[in-house]
UniProtKB/Swiss-Prot annotation:
SMART domains: RING. It is a single-pass membrane protein. GO terms for biological process: protein ubiquitination. The RING-type zinc finger domain mediates binding to an E2 ubiquitin-conjugating enzyme. GO terms for cellular component: membrane. Keywords: Membrane, Metal-binding, Signal, Transferase, Transmembrane, Transmembrane helix, Ubl conjugation pathway, Zinc, Zinc-finger. The gene is ATL21B. Pathway: Protein modification; protein ubiquitination. InterPro entries: ATL20-22-like, WAK_GUB, Znf_RING, Znf_RING/FYVE/PHD. This is Putative RING-H2 finger protein ATL21B. It catalyses: S-ubiquitinyl-[E2 ubiquitin-conjugating enzyme]-L-cysteine + [acceptor protein]-L-lysine = [E2 ubiquitin-conjugating enzyme]-L-cysteine + N(6)-ubiquitinyl-[acceptor protein]-L-lysine.
Length: 362
């Protein structure tokens, strides 16, 4: 049995520890960059082009806020960065994004709106009786008048002459479609995107993106040895090798045991076969995630807007209840879908994958 223990240790190191340890190292910015790789309570990841690129002015303040500096529009808080889609969600530090939009100018920055939508901003006297479903913009309203905004031209015209048009401007929007009523989203977040440098391919393959050299504006993907992260294909191969190694180890141990106990040969093989047959059920029973792994998934406390960043709606897909202010939601890392933290925690303990797209972390 001494030989069996040595074989077990060898296979364990070869097929489990070495591959998985190598595959789990995170990618980093260059060593010359002193900024942290994550910043703020939302732990916004900071990597190229937001480090090492002169046009992407991203800072982590002393108050632990992730701040984006736009040349013509000032500073904004960063809520979320999608490196694969090359999109960034920002908001106003004073929680009055609608006011910033009245003078918003994206010139001189590498960003552009995903869609440009023409909005009409109006002011109406408070004496004017309006339906309760006409949401005003509180931070722009006062004791005598209320401020409204809509991308529906006909709706804006119907408010005249009781209300006055303050301004008509193009506003960066998530969708090209006009709203049918007054907007309640202008104070939530602003979606911008960048097309250059193009690092989408690197991000999809979990490779590090960066300049080819200090003198060239061109970028390239750096391999696993430099970035410390392997592509999906390599990770899949390593996992397959680990499984094969486990099977070989198991069969080897059974063979050695049978060889050392000849009197029990007639029933040892069927017992081993029965054990092998039971393995898939055991694997299926343990497909859920443990609590420590679930706790590593990003959470966020919703604000007054009740709308999480990204393409998520305001309804939890699991319990079908609308989110409310101050509720905590949790995000699935691979697809950024979010749910009530208490709902998704129960789900992940059983299934271990996103209930919407079934993606799971390798």
């Amino acid at each position: 049995m001494i030989i069996s223990k040595q074989l077990f240790l060898l296979f364990f190191l070869l097929f489990f520890i070495f591959p998985l340890r190598h595959a789990s190292n995170p990618s980093k910015c260059s060593s010359s960059n002193s900024r942290p790789h994550r910043c703020g309570p939302l732990e916004v990841p900071i990597r190229f082009p937001f480090c090492d690129h002169p046009l992407f002015n991203l800072l982590c303040t002393n108050l632990n806020n992730t701040v984006l500096q736009l040349p013509m529009s000032g500073t904004f808080f960063v809520q979320y960065i999608d490196y694969r889609k090359q999109q960034i969600y920002i908001n106003d530090p004073e929680n009055c994004l609608a006011k910033r939009l009245l003078t918003f100018n994206i010139s001189g920055s590498p960003f552009s709106p995903r869609f440009d939508t023409l909005y009409t901003f109006l002011t109406c006297p408070n004496e004017l009786v309006l339906p309760s479903w006409y949401p005003s913009i509180p931070c722009l309203s006062n004791s005598t008048s209320s401020f409204f905004a809509t991308s529906n031209f006909a709706l804006a015209e119907s408010m005249l002459p009781s209300c006055q048009i303050v301004k008509r401007i193009y506003v960066p929007a998530d969708s090209p479609f006009a709203e049918t009523r007054f907007s309640s989203y202008l104070n939530q977040s602003l979606l911008l995107e960048w097309n250059s440098p193009n690092c989408r391919g690197c991000e999809i393959d979990y490779l590090r993106c960066g300049f080819k050299n200090k003198a060239s504006p061109e970028v390239k993907c750096f391999g696993a040895k430099k970035s410390g992260h392997l592509s999906r294909a390599v990770v899949a191969v390593l996992i397959c090798l680990s499984i094969i190694g486990a099977v070989i180890l198991f069969v080897t141990c059974i063979a050695i045991r049978i060889h050392n106990t000849p009197r029990r040969r007639h029933w040892a093989v069927p017992a081993a076969a029965a054990t092998v047959m039971q393995q898939p059920r055991e694997v299926m029973a343990t497909r859920g995630l443990d609590q420590s792994t679930i706790e590593k998934y990003k959470t966020m406390e919703l604000g007054e807007s009740r709308r999480p960043p990204g393409t998520n709606g305001i309804v939890c897909p699991i319990c079908l209840s609308e989110y409310v202010s101050k509720e905590t939601v949790r995000f699935i890392p691979e697809c950024d879908h979010c749910f009530h933290a208490k709902c998704i925690d129960v789900w992940l303990k059983i299934h271990g994958s996103c209930p919407l797209c079934r993606n799971s972390r390798a």
